[in-house]
Amino acid sequence: MRTVQYREALNEAMSEEMRRDPSVFLMGEEVAEYDGAYKVSKGMLAEFGPKRIIDTPISELGFSAIGVGAAMNGLRPIVEFMTWNFAILAADQIINHAAKMLQMSGGQFHVPIVFRGGNGSAGQLAATHSQSFEAMYANIPGLKVVTPSTPYDAKGLLKSAIRDDDPVLVMESERMYGDKGEIPDGEYLVPIGVAHVARKGTDVTIVSFGKMMKVALAAAEELQKEGVNAEVIDLRTIRPLDTATIIASVRKTNRLVVVDENFPMVSIASEVAYRVQKDAFDFLDAPVLRINQADTPLPFSPPLIEASLPNPARVIAAVKEVMYLVK
């Protein structure tokens, strides 16, 4: 095992897959000469050249359309968005073309494309650069959505995404690119659609994903000091959702709290709560609670940002509520 940064894990995934498969290429704003806005593609231009590491104009709709067309014609594009907030401009290509082409062509055209980039809050970037989009895209049949929370998952999930024959959206985070973690020396894959029990416990289940896993795990450690043993599940994939792992945990702990950076209306937490009450209602000893971002555009002010986003204190309070520890 060796320690790498999250950005380095993504870089290794893309580089390994490009060496393995000449049909794989990377395109996006500043991915070549500048090594990527967050240095994820550092050194790749020198190794693979300008025909496979392609700087694009500032036109998300345009280069996403090129990517979809290339995928329909036998290539495996990786399209990098500087942020998923900018991908709103490319939503027509992602939702109406990449997601639907296999069905609309009667199975004639797969679209093996990866869309990836930073997602969610990232410091004081304010309302238009701080949105979480997992729930929006997970609502679209034909798309797969993954949210790696560690360098290990970032590399393994991205490699699986590149090899997938259907469109996969990889939701990263600007706040995680510098995070460090261990990965194996040899090749490995993390399967799409399989959650991970990041912390075993017996008293309550906490489900989260992406950078909110830091919040969930921090809350679990504080709860342990008070004698509450929380099990923490990292979804890793949002669509398809690994309901079985969640249900198995809830059957053991009988309580569930979901931590989700998306807005509360029609969120990932909403879907998890529905599936648990549908398939494990008789095992619940308390209502499912969820911790979401406040139902308002994210402010610029640091105190208001802190008040808007999920944090360990809010998770701890929710856990105590489902365990009836609140006086």
Predicted regions located by residue number:
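Thiamine diphosphate
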Residues: 1-171, 174-327
